[in-house]
């Protein structure tokens, strides 16, 4: 806190002197974690609204699939109406939270093919009778992935495993198959608490790979830090996480990744920042796979050619449309679809083909990003905005345009300026809303427009640079600057460019110490419209105290 106060006069000098205390126009609570698909949701939400009203709040931001209304049931709308009526009774403005690109939102309910696509280029297929099947080219594997070959405490073929004989051990008593596994324990024997095994593998650029491993845990802490990792340079090609219990019998973890322009990758399985407990790994595999979750939309075309590329075959004449009947973002452990030949096809039995397509990626446990360059996305937004207006005569809206972790990889957006594309996306969203209500005030999460947060190059799987994105969004957009610890540089960034800001803070802390830091910054920053109590873990115990601190009742 002392650092915050000593930096205030210097870092915020461009925003003017200490501002006189004025009542904040926006005194909001973030209502998150309820989808209105159960009666209990309303029962749990309304007491929060009542607490907010008692402590001087004037708005409730609701995140409850409000951009997928055409998919909802009558029961959903009845519950939404109950929440709306409660807000009216308590004099709280109900503010919808909609239109997520980073997390897909309602757009994926309409069409999962709108997911951003990663390119597979010229994968090998061989024709057998009336179908062509994918063939690994070249075959890849994890050498000694069964952990059967070792000398003493050292496993063969791996670049390293942490602290053999201290943290990592061959285990011939506990294994998934064969006669051994690799066990990790005593994580704090090294300061970082890491317990990993790594191997370098040669891959083919722009191919899709499936990696799996079997893991067993015993009193593992923290279990969420157990993961698979694929590194190419400084980029993580598979930023995936798994919900693994602290204690569990053998279970299989599987992910897919695209090699992109790389011909070698470093693959890891292990724990980062381990504290206690132990875990085992076994039967670690890696393989190139075919068109699992092939995306079909204008920006993700499928191309089939002869092996030398001299002949391009026609979909609908030479082969049936390549689709995946088992399409699922969550199930990768299944066979890839084959390419079916049609009667009269120019493709012959025994022929080798080169096939190109696009596939999605899941980030962490469940994040799937949609493509901002696909026109159909905005048709869905327009349709859903009209339905939302029928239910809620919204005067304010917050756009869920945070953490856009993919982009610039499918044909609809490859080569585009990602900062400009993001800004154009937001501008179209605002235009859609203002067609319906010309006076609507639009708010937006800050991170993708903040160079001190996520508005930069080399962001997750994005091919491109978000630097300068703030130059392409409407200037009357209110920026919801979010986070736990105060960030004066972020507030200054937006204030200097004439944006008003809403401070979305708290972030599930055990106390309001960080909120007090944000409060101090707000008093010295022009254009702060107010605060939003923001929790992602349904921690509302400090809701009343938050309001009392900031606007006092």
Indicate residue ranges for each PLM-predicted region.
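Aromatic-lined carbohydrate-binding surfaces of glycoside hydrolases
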Residues: 25-139, 145, 356-473, 477
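Extracellular and organelle-lumenal recognition/adhesion modules and their flexible linkers in secreted
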Residues: 129-343, 348
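Glycoside hydrolase catalytic-domain groove-lining segments
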Residues: 453-517
